[in-house]
């Protein structure tokens, strides 16, 4: 009798970027009464919830540093490692940089799962690093109750090309590089409701590198970028708005989703992270239908880039996306800060 295949998602209480601590709770954790340490060379710290830290070397080049890790969102160990690494590397691309090195972070229940499973996870991470043109240069591991994997990633960028999430301008159009719905499809799979024709769609999206961010950083009209991950499209857009002192409008009819997403919402395949996200920032968002909430607050794992671009540079980024095979689509626009508490309106 054949052995049952190991299903990694059965060994974790959370999944992918849905494991993130909610924005509301995270704000409490990060609050500190200690005097802030000031370093004039630290161009980007944690003040605006940006994707990575950026340090000016003083010679026209800056170092980008980030880390990201989570528990399994798929059952296959190799795919889990690949997705986790792709997601971590994305933070470098979201700042407009070029990754140069990855360091692995591994937590593994050695008394529950065989070491060969961990080997496949790390190999998946190594594969993603090679796709990004970097080495998996080392790492650290611990024995933990649940599988955890991710990377610490170092990148470089011309100092003047850094794309912060707090440098957007009013009038910019907003574009996305991947469809939404990753959290919904992976939840449907975990519940055993995913149809055969939708198998692998979420994995393919999560494994798509956001390397186009390095090219977007060369476009002066691109004023801000971030990758859409655990806080959903609305959460990460709110970070851009609050960091840049702006408001935004999202065009719900232009949002692209993975196939089957709306049907799975109707079947109740909405991850727990969606509710936690809305609880954290729902008061900053205009009226939403339940379906809009499920899509726009859906926690993405290794999601796409959200790009703020001035109208006169829109055609440039469309051409870049076309040349690299990325299905770029408009999702909204930025406008002057509203006098009300509503940061993002959904139309």
UniProtKB/Swiss-Prot annotation:
Encoding gene, per UniProt annotation: selD
Q: What is its EC number?
A: 2.7.9.3
Where is the catalytic site?
Answer: 17
List the protein's name: Selenide, water dikinase
Query: What are the boundaries of the signal sequence?
Result: none
Q: Which cofactor does it need?
A: Mg(2+)
Q: Which CDD domains match?
A: SelD
Q: Which InterPro entries match?
A: PurM-like_C_dom, PurM-like_C_sf, PurM-like_N, PurM-like_N_sf, SelD_I, SPS/SelD
- UniProt record, GO biological process: selenocysteine biosynthetic process
Question: Catalysed reaction(s)?
Answer: hydrogenselenide + ATP + H2O = selenophosphate + AMP + phosphate + 2 H(+)
Its function, per the record, reads: Synthesizes selenophosphate from selenide and ATP.
Binding residue positions for ATP? 20, 48-50, 68, 91, 139-141
Q: What Gene3D superfamilies does the record point to?
A: PurM-like C-terminal domain (3.90.650.10), PurM-like, N-terminal domain (3.30.1330.10)
Record carries keyword Transmembrane: no
Q: Which family does it belong to?
A: Belongs to the selenophosphate synthase 1 family. Class I subfamily.
Q: Which NCBIfam families match?
A: PRK00943.1, selD
The highest taxon in the source lineage is Bacteria
Q: Pull one GO CC term from this UniProt entry.
A: cytoplasm
């Amino acid at each position: 009798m054949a052995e049952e295949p190991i299903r990694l998602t059965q060994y974790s209480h959370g999944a992918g970027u849905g494991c993130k601590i909610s924005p509301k709770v995270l704000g409490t954790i990060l609050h500190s009464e200690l005097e802030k340490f000031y370093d004039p060379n630290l161009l980007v710290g944690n003040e605006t919830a940006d994707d990575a830290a950026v340090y000016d070397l003083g010679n026209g080049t800056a170092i980008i540093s980030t880390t990201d890790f989570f528990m399994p969102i798929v059952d296959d160990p190799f795919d889990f490692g690949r997705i986790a690494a792709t997601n971590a590397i994305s933070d470098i691309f979201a700042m407009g940089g070029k990754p140069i090195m990855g360091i692995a972070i591994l937590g593994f229940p050695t008394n529950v799962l065989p070491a060969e499973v961990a080997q496949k996870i790390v190999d998946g991470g190594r594969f993603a690093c090679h796709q990004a043109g970097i080495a998996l240069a080392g790492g650290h591991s611990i024995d933990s109750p649940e599988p955890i994997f991710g990377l610490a990633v170092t990148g470089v960028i011309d100092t003047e090309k850094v794309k912060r999430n707090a440098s957007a301008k009013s009038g910019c159009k907003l574009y996305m590089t991947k469809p939404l719905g990753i959290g919904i499809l992976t939840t449907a799979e975990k519940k055993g409701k995913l149809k055969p024709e939708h198998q692998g769609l979420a994995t393919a999206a999560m494994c798509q590198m956001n390397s186009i961010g390095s090219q977007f950083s060369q476009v002066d009209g691109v004023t801000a970028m971030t990758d859409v991950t655990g806080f959903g499209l609305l959460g990460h857009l709110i970070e851009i708005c609050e960091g840049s002192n702006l408001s935004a409008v999202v065009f719900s009819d232009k949002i692209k989703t993975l196939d089957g997403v709306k049907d799975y919402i109707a079947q109740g395949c909405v991850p727990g992270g969606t509710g936690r996200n809305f609880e954290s920032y729902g008061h900053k968002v205009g009226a939403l239908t339940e379906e809009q909430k499920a899509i726009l607050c859906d926690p993405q794992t290794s999601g796409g880039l959200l790009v703020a671009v001035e109208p006169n540079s829109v055609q440039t980024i469309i051409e870049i996306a076309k040349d690299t095979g990325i299905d770029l689509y408009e999702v909204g626009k930025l406008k002057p800060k509203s006098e009300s508490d509503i940061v993002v309106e959904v139309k």
